């Protein structure tokens, strides 16, 4: 098959390398930065440069750019896409993308499926892309139609051929609701946590807890700002819930209320055990 990869950063670049390493498919790649596209070709990450003249030859089109850019790309190229092609985006929010792209696909006769590979690094760019980034990872899919079992089986088989160990099928709204907690809130908290005045003198005083909590503080502010704003309703709910929870801990400590503090700590510990086991 011919696989197009649009956007050759960490996610897209790793997809192209995974396809090259794990399959015999040909990769047609494109990045808005022409030098990255050329480097990926010289590096062996892609076979050909994706363009208007060959996009119709692609069986799968994997789009790995920001949400708004995903919609713009699909609007611009929709008439050139093969009617039998499957287009999958890799954005971190799904409702904003799927609401537009389902309609674009329907009008132009191809299939669009929302996607979100649950893997990444705290670095960005093609130079950090690796063929094994997705080994053992989960891929979330948000199709417009879950009745086409044959198509979902084919897409799942293709995705797993790249190293993913599991595929989760859900709706765009459910994805956004849960991802606000599991990913977006974690990035907000991590990024805010390192703004403590003590952060600059942490060396020699920090170990696993500090590393765990600050791992995702270093981020791409342009991408994450867009993701947060596109999912603001769900993210604000999670932020408010966290603020309320922190207020309970703060109040117990301020009032020297050890019993309440112990209860809060035990509740959190028990909650962790119940959701992980």
Locate predicted features.
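Alpha-helix C-terminal capping/helix-to-coil transition sites in glycosyltransferase folds
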Residues: 56-57, 136
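Short beta->alpha hinge that forms the Motif I/post-I loop of the SAM-binding pocket
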Residues: 32, 65, 90
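Internal alpha-helical scaffold of NAD(P)-dependent oxidoreductase catalytic cores
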Residues: 131-215
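NAD(P)+-binding Rossmann beta1-loop-alpha1 motif at the extreme N-terminus of oxidoreductases
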Residues: 1-52, 60
């Amino acid at each position: 098959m011919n696989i197009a990869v649009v956007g050759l950063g960490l996610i897209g670049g790793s997809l192209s390398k995974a396809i090259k390493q794990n399959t015999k498919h040909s990769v047609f790649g494109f990045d808005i930065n022409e030098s990255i596209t050329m480097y990926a070709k010289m590096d062996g990450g892609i076979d050909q440069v994706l363009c208007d003249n060959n996009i119709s030859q692609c069986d799968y089109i994997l789009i790995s750019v920001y949400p708004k850019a995903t919609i713009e790309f699909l609007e611009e190229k929709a008439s050139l896409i093969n009617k039998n092609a499957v287009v999958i985006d890799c954005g971190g929010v799904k409702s904003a993308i799927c609401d537009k792209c389902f309609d674009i696909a329907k009008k132009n006769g191809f299939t669009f499926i929302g996607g979100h590979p649950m893997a990444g690094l705290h670095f960005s760019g093609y130079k950090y892309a690796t063929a094994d980034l997705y080994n053992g990872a989960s891929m979330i899919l948000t199709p417009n139609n879950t009745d086409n079992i044959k198509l979902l089986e084919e897409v799942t088989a293709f995705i797993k051929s790249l190293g993913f160990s599991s595929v989760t099928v859900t709706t765009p709204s459910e994805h956004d609701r849960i991802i606000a907690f599991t990913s977006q809130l974690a990035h907000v908290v991590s990024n805010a946590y390192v703004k403590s005045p003590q952060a600059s003198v942490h060396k020699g005083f920090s170990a696993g807890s500090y590393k765990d909590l600050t791992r995702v503080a270093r981020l791409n502010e342009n991408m994450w700002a867009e993701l947060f704003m596109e999912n603001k309703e769900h993210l604000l709910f999670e932020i408010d819930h966290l603020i309320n929870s922190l207020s309970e801990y703060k109040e117990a400590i301020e009032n020297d209320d050890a019993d309440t503090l112990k209860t809060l700590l035990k509740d959190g510990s028990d909650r962790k055990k119940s959701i992980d086991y």
